[in-house]
Design a protein with these regions (language model features):
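Repeated scaffold domains used in trafficking and secretory/extracellular systems
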Residues: 62-69, 112-125, 169-186, 216-226, ...
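Short, well-ordered beta-strand elements
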Residues: 339-351, 368-374, 397, 609
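Extracytoplasmic/periplasmic substrate-binding proteins
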Residues: 527-608
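Hinge/lid segment of periplasmic solute-binding proteins
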Residues: 403-456, 569-583
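Extracytoplasmic "Venus flytrap"/periplasmic binding protein-like
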Residues: 369-431, 440, 562-563
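C-terminal capping/gating helix-and-loop segments adjacent to ligand/active sites or protein-protein/ligand interfaces
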Residues: 588, 645-714
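Helix-loop-helix "hinge/cap" segment bordering the ligand-binding cleft or interdomain interface
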Residues: 91, 128, 153, 157, ...
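A bilobed periplasmic-binding-protein/Venus flytrap-type ligand-binding module shared by bacterial periplasmic
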Residues: 457-462, 584-602, 621-625, 631-632
Length: 717
């Protein structure tokens, strides 16, 4: 379960624009009416300048793009896949691929564990010659590795030379053991081999010609515009770009700019562009002024292209080619006249699932596109302040986790049940039943959860007697009879953590939100509270432990196996109903809920977008169970299959088919939803604190919780 998670961080700097308020209460309970391709357009939409995107598949045997450049009518790339890196060339006209001669085994290949013994850290072209910097990590003799410089003729693909770098980088203040990190061609026969403090000018045989201290500039930015080269410049604390004369090495004056002065950009058309504000901007190299070309979100065809890339090249025809970090393909972005589409305004947060849906929607819908705005534009706002902004500005879709819970009703949002019932691609039966039931409140579905998580308790497999016999008596006896010094929980699961768990499950076990009632004075709440108080906790990181509370299913398998030093079972909480586990609306500790405003003029199109987040196709890239459990069964099954993974070196981090079967059984047998409610948590926590301190009896504590919670829960119904 510790598979590398693809982490994407959005930084959308979009301003909230004001608009007139709509009508409250509109759309409740009315079945949507479809007319053609949603509710826009009459077939005579205006065409405006824009961009169209195309995905270019990598050649067979390649699974990711590592580095990329362009020369004339050829796109050149370092691709990963299989046992070796591949040096690839694509003809721009035919988009056909060929390979340059390169064998990883010449540089150490892979070791006995399957890890590559080399890497490619430099890949650039100048005057028709491609330069490649290969770092060999270790020698067969056991000594430190070497750096190698390879040169290729771009037209023929023929290898021109290869040479081992015969000198070492100079130790400096940045690193006592510096390494060569970049290779910048300065012509067909000269290049700059760089560490973090110096540029070493070398010839075609990697012989040192001259050493240039990186004072006032560095190669964090490489911008090639035709025959001109620009680099990152520094002066008196200011950062910008400087021209770099490839013959004399002279630097031009610093040109300050708000664009990001890092990354790799090449234009065969002679234009200058850089990344800025999650998009590409044209750049005036004389003034530093920029103008937006496009946002990644507007042109990206999938999540791998919707990030701050820092790598883009442009052909002489004006087409841009982009690739994210280890992208599975290359994206071509071409200027074109496009249909002027209506906007669906989404106020949200950084949510990988909803972003993926937005990208799919924007790349396929002919009449609408989603504009993704971060709520609050980077300002810390209260839920009430955000609600006031929503009422003022009236976007089409809002992230409901940012709003007061009692505002999510027919007064502000449309009921989505009629949309689900009228949709041919999804139905109520497609949802995990208890999750759908929990979303229906106050007579309708006003908040659509796209992901949930599970609260549970795992126990060492050999200690689990089965759910029927998993009682408080059994658990207390198990703890009393444990070996001396063996902890109950791992050290970071303290009393406060376990009390928070009890507060969370209480909202599902002892509260009926629809009826507005609670039952803390019935059942075994008092005994669970006493258990939280009396359980021995530890501050030492000792293993094995007896139990592990699960607040997020994504890491449950790896944590349980590590803490137990063996197998696990989902036992659930003792003396609770069903399987003792609970869905929670807070996946990865934040709610993934959205609603369509009743005032929206594009409700049908907004639903067409929102439902994409529920479909199994939305799970294809970037998401895994660490982000939560999809609320539809088909999407959940896709995630289960995606997450099956065997870690040969660290088996405890594997997620096997047996693990998938256990999780499937847990999810489909869980019956209740435990909502994250700050007020209920505050009531239970403050009353429990007095009990734990010995200032109040258990009976009085439970009585006070029941009294205070009854009033609060009744107000929410």
């Amino acid at each position: 379960m510790s598979k590398r998670i693809f982490a994407l961080l959005l930084a959308l700097a979009l301003l909230l624009s004001l608009c007139a308020c709509g009508k409250e209460g509109a759309g409740k309970g009315e079945a949507p009416v479809r007319s053609g391709n949603t509710d826009a357009g009459d077939g005579s939409a205006e065409m405006v300048p824009g961009y169209i995107s195309q995905v270019i598949e990598l050649p067979e045997g390649c699974s990711s793009v590592r580095l990329m450049t362009i020369e004339g009518d050829k796109l050149l790339a370092v691709c990963g896949g299989g046992e070796d890196y591949r040096l690839c060339a694509m003809e721009l006209g035919s988009e056909s691929w060929s390979f340059l001669p390169f064998k990883g085994e010449d540089f150490g290949g892979r070791d006995s564990r399957g890890f590559s013994n080399y890497g490619i850290s430099g890949f650039d072209v100048c005057d028709g010659v491609l330069w490649v910097l290969v770092r060999q990590y270790f020698m067969e003799s056991g000594g430190e590795g070497r750096f190698h410089v390879l040169r290729y003729d771009c037209a023929s693909g023929e290898e021109l030379s290869r040479a081992e770098v015969g000198f070492e980088a100079i130790a400096g203040t940045e690193s006592s053991t510096p390494i060569f990190s970049d290779l910048i061609p300065l012509g067909a026969d000269r290049a700059a081999l760089c560490d973090y403090e110096n540029a070493y000018i070398i010839d075609s045989q990697a012989r040192l010609l001259e050493t240039l201290p990186l004072e006032g500039f560095n190669f964090n930015l490489v911008l090639r515009r035709g025959e001109e080269l620009y680099v990152c410049g520094e002066e008196n604390g200011d950062i910008g770009l400087r021209s770099f004369d490839m013959e004399s090495f002279a630097l031009g004056s610093l040109v300050k700019t708000e664009a990001n002065c890092y990354g790799y950009y090449v234009s065969e058309k002679g234009e200058a562009f850089l990344s800025q504000d999650n998009g590409l901007v044209s750049l005036d190299v004389n003034t530093g002024e920029t103008e937006s070309l496009f946002k990644w979100l507007e042109v990206a065809t999938s999540l791998e292209f919707a990030q701050e890339m820092g790598m883009a090249v442009q052909s002489a025809a004006g087409d841009y080619y982009t690739a994210g970090i280890s992208s599975r393909n290359i994206q071509k972005v071409s200027p074109s006249l496009v249909k002027d589409r209506e906007l669906i305004r989404l106020w949200g947060v950084s949510d990988l699932g909803i972003l993926n849906a937005a990208l799919r929607f924007n790349s396929t819908n002919e009449d609408y596109r989603v504009e993704y705005e971060l709520i609050g534009s980077g300002h810390e706002l209260s839920q009430q302040e955000i609600l006031e902004l929503v009422l003022q500005d009236r976007p089409d879709i809002v992230y409901t986790g940012s709003l007061p819970q009692n505002s999510i009703d027919a007064g502000l949002f449309v009921d989505l049940l009629p949309y689900i019932d009228a949709d041919e691609s999804i139905s109520r039966e497609d949802f995990i039943e208890p999750v759908l039931e929990s979303m229906i409140r106050k007579g309708g579905l006003y908040e659509l959860l796209t992901q949930v998580d599970v609260l549970s308790l795992t126990v060492r497999a050999e200690l689990f007697p089965g759910r029927k016999d998993w009682t408080m008596d059994y658990v207390e006896e198990m703890i009393a009879n444990r070996p001396t010094g063996e902890p109950v929980y791992f050290w970071h699961r303290d009393q406060k953590y376990m009390l928070d768990m009890l507060c969370r499950i209480s909202s599902g076990e002892y509260v009926d939100w629809e009826a507005g009632t609670c039952s803390f004075d019935e059942g075994d709440f008092a005994r669970l509270l006493q258990f939280v108080k009396d359980t021995p906790y530890t501050t030492e990181a000792a293993t094995p432990v007896l139990m592990e509370p699960i607040m997020g299913i994504g890491s449950s398998v790896a944590l349980s196996r590590n803490f137990f030093q063996g197998d696990y079972e989902y036992a659930g909480f003792p003396e609770t109903s069903g399987n003792g586990s609970y869905f929670t609306d807070s996946a990865q500790f934040s709610k993934n809920g959205y609603g369509i405003l009743a005032s929206s003029e594009h409700k049908e199109a907004a639903w067409d977008f929102l439902r994409l987040a529920l479909l199994p196709e939305n799970q294809e890239y970037g998401l895994d169970l660490s982000f939560g459990i999809p609320v539809t069964k088909a999407a959940f099954e896709v995630q289960l299959e995606k997450n099956i993974y065997e870690d040969v070196m660290f088996p405890e981090y594997s997620f096997t088919r047996e693990d998938a079967d256990k999780l499937r059984e847990l999810v489909y047998s869980t019956e209740k939803m435990a909502l994250k409610d700050d007020t209920l948590t505050e009531i239970i926590s403050t009353e429990a604190a007095a009990c734990f301190a010995g200032d109040k009896s258990l009976e009085d504590t439970v009585r006070n919780i029941q009294s205070r919670a009854s009033i609060y829960v009744a107000e929410q119904a």
